[in-house]
């Protein structure tokens, strides 16, 4: 199911995005962020993170570096170490 949710993002990244100028104000780009968020957090949480990120990508936001937050399992394992 997760792989199926990633197909439209991949289509956008490789078929549509190269035809348009680079408009994303963030690094990584919003499509890369969405792909990584869904891959790491699953469809629901990753999708929510992607929607929030798209909501922040507008001309009045400065943008900048905005990585996907780590998945909960990686947070707890780094704390335990």
Curated annotation (Swiss-Prot):
It is found in: Cell inner membrane. Its main location: membrane. One of its GO terms (cellular component) is plasma membrane. Keywords: Cell inner membrane, Cell membrane, Membrane. It is a peripheral membrane protein. Pfam families: YidD (PF01809). SMART domains: Haemolytic (SM01234). It comes from the Bacteria. InterPro entries: Membr_insert_effic_factor_YidD. Residues 61-81 are annotated as: Disordered. Belongs to the UPF0161 family. PANTHER family: MEMBRANE PROTEIN INSERTION EFFICIENCY FACTOR-RELATED. Could be involved in insertion of integral membrane proteins into the membrane. NCBIfam families: membrane protein insertion efficiency factor YidD. This is Putative membrane protein insertion efficiency factor.
């Amino acid at each position: 199911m997760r792989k199926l949710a990633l197909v439209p993002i991949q289509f956008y990244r490789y078929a549509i995005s190269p035809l348009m100028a680079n408009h994303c104000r963030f690094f990584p780009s919003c499509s890369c962020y969405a792909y990584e968020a869904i891959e790491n957090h699953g469809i629901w949480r990753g999708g929510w993170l992607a929607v929030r990120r798209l909501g922040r990508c507008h001309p009045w936001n400065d943008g900048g570096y905005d990585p996907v937050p780590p998945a909960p399992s990686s947070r707890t394992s780094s704390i335990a170490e």
